[in-house]
């Protein structure tokens, strides 16, 4: 099974920079003029120093991908870490005056077995082999497509580009400050928010033919007094064999949260509102297998 070789950042950052940029310079599209090369070098150095400070380690291929986004002028600079989890790290970056979120999947710690389960049931993808590289690239491509589709229908960040295990999307926040999660909000009009969220779930299902798959108060941000759905990595199309079990779980999560806010909510009613159908007991039983 092919796999990326995880290489820690060198103690001498200059050596690391030299090696990575030497590899980049071998590619024709990254033949940069001297001044821009110098500018990029300083940004790369700061990025590596920030990674070292945060005890973040990426394999060489991932660093090459991140640096190529600077060299190719897809991004202006990386600013800092927004969120760090077991399977992915989200960075804040800029593209000119616009902020971007850069999601980097950790090659060494991703749950490839779970990823395969979600990808293989999606008719948009046909994995003939199951190498780690193919799986993670398909996973990023799937999230990219899901975001593109969702952002046309509901409040969700627009995906800008994807490259290997890296996904670039719009940053949800205020002047570079991340928007708060729904779980951290106080004194909102909870009835209003529940109504907007259930309408968004319905539109996503009917118009986008998508099920979020991991929807909860943790994956909904609040910006301009509106909910914004994020993290579409587990989202599936409605034809996927796990679509309805995942939708039931989403309905349970949302109703559990809003009931704590004293909003009258029943997950079976929410599911019927979204799909127009009663819950199939077989689908509900499958939740335990997710």
Swiss-Prot record:
Disulfide bonds: none annotated. Mg(2+) binds at residues 219, 231. The keyword Lipid biosynthesis does not apply. Its EC number is 2.7.11.1, 3.6.1.-. It catalyses: L-seryl-[protein] + ATP = O-phospho-L-seryl-[protein] + ADP + H(+); L-threonyl-[protein] + ATP = O-phospho-L-threonyl-[protein] + ADP + H(+); ATP + H2O = ADP + phosphate + H(+). ATP binds at residues 82-90, 103. Keywords: ATP-binding, Hydrolase, Kinase, Magnesium, Metal-binding, Nucleotide-binding, Serine/threonine-protein kinase, Transferase. Residues 76-290 form the Protein kinase domain. InterPro entries: Kinase-like_dom_sf, Prot_kinase_dom, RIO-type_Ser/Thr_kinase, RIO_dom, RIO_kinase, RIO_kinase_CS, Tyr_kinase_AS. Pfam families: RIO1 (PF01163). The active site is at 214 (proton acceptor), 231 (4-aspartylphosphate intermediate). One of its GO terms (molecular function) is hydrolase activity. Despite the protein kinase domain is proposed to act predominantly as an ATPase. Belongs to the protein kinase superfamily. RIO-type Ser/Thr kinase family. This is RIO-type serine/threonine-protein kinase Rio1.
